[in-house]
Amino acid sequence: MAKVIFLENCTFLIPTKIDSEDRKVNLTLVVDYLLKHFKTNIIIAEQDTESKVKSFFKWGSKVKHIFVPSTNDFFHKTRLLNIMIKAATTDVVVSYDSDIILPLNQYLDAFALLNSKQIHFAYPFNSRVYHIEKAQRGLFEKNLSLDDVGSHTTMKHPGVPPGGVLFMNKAEFAKCGYENENFKSWGAEDIERTVRIEKMGYAVARMNGLIFHLEHDRTPHSTDVNPHYKENENEFKKTVAMSKEEIENYIRSWRF
């Protein structure tokens, strides 16, 4: 039996909308992986007209499921994250995409850093994304171990991603306004958050290690052709141009 790692003062926040079979499979794999290896807290917030997660939810009291009814055609990730952050009762919260897997030591190292109060925000990786293609997903699923994936990955995108997984001190993130719900669908919400946190005077650590992505089909709302992409870019540019004082005033104007 695998050794369980205790991360009890930590809550993983997983926003989702099940718009394909891939999303269902990947969410299940991610939650199974976290529960196999960690004694921790997990919240899933699901946006949809009717819950699809309920039909395959198998984790009982180990996972909290929040259903957020919505007729919006876009995925409002930032709103779901804010709902989960406010529901979390731990000092450390983790913004966690529903298709990301990390080597185990990276979770532990990031949590230890935040739990020590040395730093309040940390990305637990510093590599380009390694993609686990759908055809290779079964290799991971068999034992829920990255050791089984080995070289069966691809690298498609240059640079280190600005999102995926971010460990955060909940109280300090509150001072930064939490998530910016002006972002809708996909585009720039992760990098805006990092820029805003840094402009508020905090360091955002990048820790050594890899990041793996479970591949999936994409709807137009998961790409830069979504109708909100330009507005998202403008929202990001607004944050980039602001001073700390201007950001503080802007946060006070938010009504979400």
Per-range role (PLM):
Residues 71-87:
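Glycine-rich, basic loop-to-helix element that forms the pyrophosphate-binding segment
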Residues 103-181:
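Conserved catalytic core of nucleotide-sugar-dependent glycosyltransferases
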Residues 1-32:
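N-proximal low-complexity "stem/linker" segments adjacent to membrane-targeting elements
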Residues 88-91, 178:
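Active-site acidic short loop of glycosyltransferases
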Residues 90-103:
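Short beta-strand-to-loop acidic/aromatic patch adjacent to the donor-nucleotide binding site
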Residues 77-82, 99-100, 107, 161-165, ...:
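Conserved glycosyltransferase catalytic-site signature
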Residues 5, 22-26, 160, 181-256:
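C-terminal catalytic/acceptor-binding lobe
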Residues 31-69:
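Acidic donor-binding segment of Leloir-type glycosyltransferases
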